[in-house]
């Protein structure tokens, strides 16, 4: 699934979009951008709130890149461009809150750590905060996160 732009909310240049397999094979959409500056300050990993999506953060992504940060954003399972667990795609559902924890660990191990420069910072809104601050995501990032 491509990112969606509007005239007032364009996609920041240089995006790399992909999917990783979450727990149970659920496709999880992510996007990442390199820093717009040669002087790099690390990577900001954005973890949206409930019912949010990558596109909501385009303005934030642009500002962070202009300040020398790479950015990686994850769409939660059941939200944004990620896979759904219900037939009705308008309903968000997760079998266990621990699935979010597993998704963050996979996102860090497969997307952020291999392809984005350290140190790693978490920028989380609402539901994103408890999901990225639980023990497994922090352990997946190791001593390289969260600053």
Cite the ranges covered by each PLM segment.
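An N-terminal hydrophobic leader/cap segment in hydrolases
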Residues: 1-21, 28-36, 122
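Alpha/beta-hydrolase fold nucleophile elbow
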Residues: 114-126
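Active-site glycine-rich loops that stabilize anionic/oxyanionic intermediates
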Residues: 47-52
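Alpha/beta-hydrolase active-site loop
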Residues: 92-112
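A conserved short beta-strand
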Residues: 141-147
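Short glycine-enriched nucleophile-adjacent loop
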Residues: 129-140
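Conserved alpha/beta-hydrolase
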Residues: 61-87
């Amino acid at each position: 699934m491509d990112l969606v732009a509007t005239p007032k909310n364009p996609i920041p240049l240089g995006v790399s979009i992909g999917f990783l397999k979450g727990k149970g094979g659920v496709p999880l959409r992510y996007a990442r951008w390199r820093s717009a500056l040669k002087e790099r300050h690390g990577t900001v990993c954005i973890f949206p709130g409930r019912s949010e999506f990558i596109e909501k953060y385009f303005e934030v992504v642009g500002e962070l890149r202009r300040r020398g940060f790479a950015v990686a954003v994850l769409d939660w399972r059941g939200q944004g461009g990620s896979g759904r667990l219900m037939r009705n795609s308008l309903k968000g559902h997760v079998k266990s809150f621990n699935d979010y924890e597993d998704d963050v660990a996979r996102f860090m191990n497969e997307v952020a750590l291999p392809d984005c420069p350290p140190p790693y910072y978490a920028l989380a809104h609402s539901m994103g905060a408890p999901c990225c601050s639980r023990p497994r995501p922090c352990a997946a990032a190791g001593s390289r996160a969260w600053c």
